[in-house]
Regions:
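Soluble N-terminal domains of membrane-associated systems
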Residues: 1-102
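A short structural micro-motif
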Residues: 44-47, 113-117
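Core alpha-helical transmembrane segments of integral membrane proteins
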Residues: 119-121
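N-terminal loops that bind phosphate or other acidic moieties
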Residues: 100-109, 113
């Protein structure tokens, strides 16, 4: 019989992953390079008290794990564009989180707005 370690996600962990993954997705789909996306995701995690997070980003996939006892998240990137405005706004939200100027929930709402906006062609 195999016994699996079943991690239970708290609301804060789920919200942290939601914010981190959405920020990563916006950045990568907007043309940011993978190492910059990983750096931003890691910085947000550290800001939220998760110093042992792991992220791995390629041109088509984002993988993220908050800590060893949490479920990993993976997202496949299907579209890419160049949108420096979206990158700048997403980085601004990351900075505001680091400074404590915005709550996790507000950051998620602002990131959702950025994500839902159409790219300017």
């Amino acid at each position: 019989m195999t016994i699996y370690n079943q991690a239970i996600e708290s609301y804060n962990e789920k919200m942290a992953k939601d914010v981190i993954m959405l920020a990563g997705r916006i950045l990568l789909e907007s043309g940011a390079e993978g190492s910059r996306v990983e750096d931003t995701m890691t910085r947000i995690a550290i800001t939220l008290g998760h110093k042992e997070s792991n992220s791995f980003v390629t041109n088509t996939v984002i993988n993220f794990m908050l800590h060893d006892e949490s479920y990993p998240r993976m997202y496949r990137i299907r579209t890419r564009d160049t949108n420096l405005h979206r990158i700048s706004r997403t980085n601004g939200i990351s900075r505001r989180l680091a400074l404590g100027d915005i709550s996790l929930e507000d950051a998620f709402q602002e990131l959702q707005k950025i994500y839902q906006e159409q790219s300017i062609k």
